[in-house]
Amino acid sequence: MFKSSLRLRRVLLIGLALLLPAMGAHAEDPPLVRATNAVRVLNDIMQAPDKAIPTDLLRDARAIAVIPDMIKAGFIFGGRRGEGLISVKTPDGTWSNPSFITMTGGSVGFQAGVSSTDVILVFRTQRGVDSIVNGKFTLGADASAAAGPVGRTASAATDGQLKAEIYSYSRTRGLFAGVALDGSALRIDYDANAAIYGPGITPRRIFEGGVSNVPAPVVDFRDRLEEYTQR
């Protein structure tokens, strides 16, 4: 019994040693690099019309979040971490300047390896937007999420998809075949926001247009959303 316990502890320690470097290697992308990568992900997904997010979904969306290169690593216990941006639809129908965010989550069960996943979240209701403005949002708890339809229109969406408040899109490379997002927490990255917009700037102020001298890579993210919405 003692030997079995010792063996299990050794396995868990090995797994932890493998997991932590993988999670930490991508933990602190500079904000402007993050913005550039988010634009790349958005462009890559939207440039294939038959596999893109339907433009009618983008037109009706309340917010869109892009998390490039989210890392998922696992060995018995698993974890995921990513950093990205989120913009919300303003009252006049245009897209706001983005706030910086993080996404984290965990899982238990047999798993081994590391994968990198690009994630896009399309918020269909105001409820999820209000939660993230207040600082934190959990997929599956604060709003239901489902894999979103792809193609030229959203007409092919299933009943389950139509009931979801958030559509998720992912592109995964590595050892994992997909990504499960329920239970993942989105949080405002106040440090990154301060680095770009200045100290003390709230997400609400960013979304309502109360910032100036926004760096070009951050503006480019907003402009790409405008472009793909108007197609």
Segments (PLM) and residue ranges:
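Small-residue-enriched, tightly packed secondary-structure blocks
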Residues: 28-231
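Bacterial N-terminal signal peptides
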Residues: 11-21
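Bacterial N-terminal signal peptides that target proteins for export
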Residues: 2-13
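Sec/Tat signal peptide C-region and signal peptidase I cleavage site
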Residues: 23-27
